[in-house]
């Protein structure tokens, strides 16, 4: 990975969206819900006022409209401020 977030930002690899429903109905790309969970793959150095509490490998939840989408090496990522992350999972 050669993307290094700056300041209090984190780079997240979103979890894959569901391909089909429990009943077996295939969901087209246009109807899929945006995932709200992902894995932290890179973190910034923090700021003078805010220390980074997230770590690479953390599974996190974030808001539906959080972050900026970007694509790198064929994968889609989100970059957002640490404060946009709502929770760390288990």
From Swiss-Prot:
GO MF, one annotated term: ATP binding
Single biological process term from Gene Ontology: chaperone cofactor-dependent protein refolding
Superkingdom in the source lineage: Bacteria
Keywords (A to Z) from UniProt: Chaperone, Cytoplasm
Listed GO CC annotations: cytoplasm
Stored InterPro entries: Chaperonin_GroES, Chaperonin_GroES_sf, GroES-like_sf
Record family assignment: Belongs to the GroES chaperonin family.
Assembly, per entry: Heptamer of 7 subunits arranged in a ring. Interacts with the chaperonin GroEL.
Protein's name according to its UniProt entry: Co-chaperonin GroES
Originating organism: Phocaeicola vulgatus (strain ATCC 8482 / DSM 1447 / JCM 5826 / CCUG 4940 / NBRC 14291 / NCTC 11154)
């Amino acid at each position: 990975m050669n993307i290094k977030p700056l300041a209090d930002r984190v780079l997240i690899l979103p979890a894959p969206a569901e391909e089909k429903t429990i009943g077996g109905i295939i969901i087209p790309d246009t109807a899929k819900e945006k995932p709200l969970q992902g894995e932290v793959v890179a973190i910034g150095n923090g700021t003078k006022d805010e220390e980074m509490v997230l770590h690479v490998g953390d599974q996190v939840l974030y808001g539906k409209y959080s972050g900026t989408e970007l694509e790198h090496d064929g994968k889609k990522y989100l970059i957002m401020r640490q404060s946009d992350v709502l929770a760390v999972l288990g």
